[in-house]
């Protein structure tokens, strides 16, 4: 399943290539991918057509695109995308038609470009036909922080297709009203004083209603470790189960939970409330580090199901210390001159990977 680094890589790609483009048409190939858009496919098509993609935002594993009305005003709802287990958002730029032969016919390169543009990917579920870049977009953001990415860097004067591809159909697209979600520190004027005034809520503090229950993730500028610590202290659940709870800390899935727990030398079943303040701090630092490192590598691609908007794979799997390494030596133990092989153990209908020496099981009570 795509986790925070993979979704952020897709968000950045959309911000780079698609913002400022108006939606000329919507083609729903498989309505199952719109099951969370309760008014149905016809409403989805009508609501998007004529609006422009304004900003690209993310919280945890959720991505959303704010929209501009024809007059440039911010629309009161956003397009939410959840990639599920196998979802992809792909960008296809329309050939500009400037590369013709002297006789006026198509060149081989242009013909190939047109064929690539017209090709329908396998498992295509929804296609947005986008126009050239206009003047109605506002910059998108990660977790609400400002960004200057615009589609002007990539064939801004030609059309584009934004394709939602999903093999397993666990993901989907839907429209959700925007609601305020002002960080406590901002509301108290401790940071960004005056930014929220006279009832005006900036776009970066608006989230889709369907996403508001999702906790802030470690790459969010307003992520508060103290809030997470308090949630840890209220539960006796194992720490990995808590890390996967998107209402506690978002964006962390099975891969990065195992990687962070390995770095913090914690067993996945250790009750969250038994972590000391220092252990909590070390774990959250490990989570943040592994997410940042994976993001820098373009995410983790074990197969063709995860790619960025241009269809390119990430390569963080080359740097994994725990996940998928059952039977291989623990890197940390090997550096210390010890021999300890990583083990794979069942965990909630999936697997956990750990070092039996570095990450000892908690004592039974």
Regions found by a protein language model. Give the residues of each.
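Structured catalytic/nucleic-acid-binding cores of DNA maintenance enzymes
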Residues: 1-365
């Amino acid at each position: 399943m795509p986790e925070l680094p993979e979704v952020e890589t897709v968000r950045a790609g959309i911000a780079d290539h698609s913002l400022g483009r108006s939606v000329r048409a919507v083609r729903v190939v498989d309505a199952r991918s719109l099951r969370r858009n309760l008014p149905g496919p016809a409403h989805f098509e009508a609501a998007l057509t004529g609006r422009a993609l304004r900003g690209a935002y993310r919280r945890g594993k959720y991505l959303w695109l704010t929209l501009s009305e024809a007059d440039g005003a911010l629309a009161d709802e956003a397009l939410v995308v959840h990639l599920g287990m196998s979802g992809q958002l792909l960008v296809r730029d329309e050939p500009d038609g400037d590369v013709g032969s002297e006789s006026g016919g198509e060149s081989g390169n242009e013909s190939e470009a047109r064929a690539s543009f017209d090709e329908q990917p396998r498992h295509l579920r929804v296609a947005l036909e986008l126009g050239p870049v206009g003047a109605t977009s506002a910059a998108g953001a990660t977790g609400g922080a400002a960004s200057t990415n615009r589609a002007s860097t990539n064939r801004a004067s030609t059309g584009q297709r934004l394709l939602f591809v999903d093999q397993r159909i666990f993901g989907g697209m839907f429209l959700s009203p925007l609601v305020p979600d002002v960080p406590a520190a901002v509301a108290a004027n401790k940071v960004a004083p005056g930014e929220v005034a006279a009832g005006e809520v900036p776009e970066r503090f608006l989230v889709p209603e369907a996403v508001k229950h999702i906790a802030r993730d470690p790459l969010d500028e307003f992520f508060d470790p103290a809030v997470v610590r308090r949630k840890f202290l209220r539960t006796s659940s194992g720490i990995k189960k808590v890390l996967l709870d998107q209402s506690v800390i978002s964006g962390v899935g099975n891969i990065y939970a195992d990687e962070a727990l390995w770095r913090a030398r914690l067993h996945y079943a250790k009750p969250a409330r038994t972590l000391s303040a220092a252990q909590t701090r070390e774990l959250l630092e490990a989570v943040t580090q592994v997410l940042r490192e994976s993001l820098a590598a373009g995410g983790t691609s074990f197969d063709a199901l995860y790619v960025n908007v241009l269809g390119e794979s990430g390569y963080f799997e080359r740097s994994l210390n725990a996940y998928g390494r059952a039977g291989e030596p623990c890197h940390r133990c090997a550096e210390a001159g010890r021999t300890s092989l990583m083990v794979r153990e069942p965990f909630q209908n999936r697997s956990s990977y750990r070092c039996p020496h570095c990450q000892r099981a908690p004592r039974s009570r």
